[in-house]
């Protein structure tokens, strides 16, 4: 369970309803793949990821980014049991994909930055703090399969 106040929960749900998973997901995943190029090894089926242009024009990056952000949107509906919500996905990432669990934190950081770029002046320090808490819980839940 993530320890969020009622105000933080309200900020998160209210803001998330304004988020376009397709746009933000592409931006966040693309940023991670470009900023941390070693993470590309988990996405070899995506084809050309050799440059920033290739990454941000890659349909598979956009599709997977949207999928991840849609999953986060669903997790927001389960804030009282994020670990339970992500239990199977955590197991899949650890046992099948062998993803470095720190990459979940990297992706969440890229998502925060992408949200700030998208929301601009609406991305207040209070909102950032709420999402930082939520994303820390999500990264922890996804890394749970490694323990």
From Swiss-Prot:
Keyword RNA-binding appears in the UniProt entry: no
Alphabetical UniProt keywords: Heme, Iron, Metal-binding, Oxygen transport, Transport
Gene3D superfamilies: Globins
Gene Ontology terms for molecular function: heme binding; metal ion binding; oxygen binding; oxygen carrier activity
Tissues in which the UniProt entry reports expression: Red blood cells.
Domain Globin stretches: 3-147
Heme keyword on record: yes
Cellular component, GO, one term: hemoglobin complex
Binding locations of heme b: 64, 93
Subunit (UniProt): Heterotetramer of two alpha chains and two beta chains.
Family: Belongs to the globin family.
PANTHER family the UniProt entry points to: HEMOGLOBIN FAMILY MEMBER, HEMOGLOBIN SUBUNIT BETA-1
Job description of the protein: Involved in oxygen transport from the lung to the various peripheral tissues.
Protein's name according to its UniProt entry: Hemoglobin subunit beta-1
Gene: hbb1
